[in-house]
Amino acid sequence: MSTRKYSKELVDGPNQAASRSMLRGVGFTTEDFSKPFVGIASTGAKVTPCNMHINELSEIVENSVNSSGGKGVLFNTITVSDGISMGTQGMKYSLISREVIADSIETVVGCLAYDGLITVGGCDKNMPGCLIGIARLNRPSIFIYGGSIKPSDENTDYVTVSEKVGEFSKGSINEDELIHYEKISVEGPGSCGGMYTANTMASAIEALGMSLPGSSSQDAISDSKNNDCVNAGIAIMNLLEKDIKPSDIMTREAFENAITVVIALGGSTNAVLHLLAMAHSIGVELCLDDFTKIGKKTPVLADLKPFGKHYMSELNANGGIQPLMKNLLERGLLHGKCMTVTGNTLEENLKDIEPYTNNEIIKSFEDPIKEDSHLRILYGNLAKDGAVAKITGKEGT
């Protein structure tokens, strides 16, 4: 199987001299034309902390692809920020941005005949947008998560500020105290640090098998995240050699794995919306009732914000989500034979994973946060086609 299934039509032969000439103008060499082209879709932008570092990560990916025998080609797509636009007219654009991301990635890769694709995302809608684009194209692909922000020195984050707005409205704190939290709570790059939408979807994608092990929990600014980018450049060449496509990875069983991990982590209700769209894009039948079926046998184990105590950076320091996935696999709650972007199956990836050193963040099956899913699918006259609610067991406390 040729690793240049698409690019050869763009650059091979005398008739494509003009195309090659244009590519030489952006730095291609004669040798590059015989290599597989790998598109690198960056969601980097300075509109939000979630994405302000992603262009730099994407350049690491590009260099890794180039040094691994491919030709990396970096391009950008958009991002917006729900956290900034929340409560304003700007939120009307939030879900639309998912489709713009998917459409733009599909457009560039399809037009310019890239043989493989690596996408790098940070803010909420980046993850499903990238995966929908990947699914439509169905070329060897990897998703890289931009990583989480660390909490402030006072152990606060963006959501803390939202809570302080409520306290100010109630009269519990004054405006100076509110401004203090505003100034100190978001310090540098990375996605919101709890199990909010971004970390939920990053974890779902790792469980799905479309990102490298560990990608979902790594800190945005860290050696491990830089290494994730280097390793992705190496891994994409393996996927091209073996012709492992998203359709080989994003199977019905893999989506069931993703749902299971989302529930165990106490993840966002938005996962329902996004996983359904991702499954549809790859031709996998998935419905609301699947979340109920899986939820009846899957406990919530993670004591993570917003309803818990801990941040993703703390879970990362304790091993990330891989030990959790191994626990779920050993309990028969995950499908171990699913292929992943490592070129190995899920159970092969998890074989040598060490257990957590304690149960402070990820609880044991004997002492769960909740014995079944926190995600509830509701039907009624207000939602004839279904609705999603989150029930943590702490309501009213």
Regions found by a protein language model. Give the residues of each.
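Hydrophobic pocket-lining residues that define ligand/cofactor binding sites across diverse proteins
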Residues: 65, 108-109
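Short, glycine/acidic-rich beta->alpha junctions
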Residues: 100-101, 122-126, 253
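Catalytic or ion-coupling anion/metal-binding cores of large enzyme and transporter domains
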Residues: 1-52, 57-77, 83-84, 89-94, ...
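Conserved phosphate-coordination/catalytic loops
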Residues: 95-99
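A short, small-residue-rich loop immediately preceding and capping a beta-strand
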Residues: 109-130, 142-145
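Short, charged beta->alpha transition segments
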Residues: 24-28, 103-108
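Well-ordered alpha-helical segments embedded in enzymatic catalytic cores
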Residues: 100-107, 129, 257
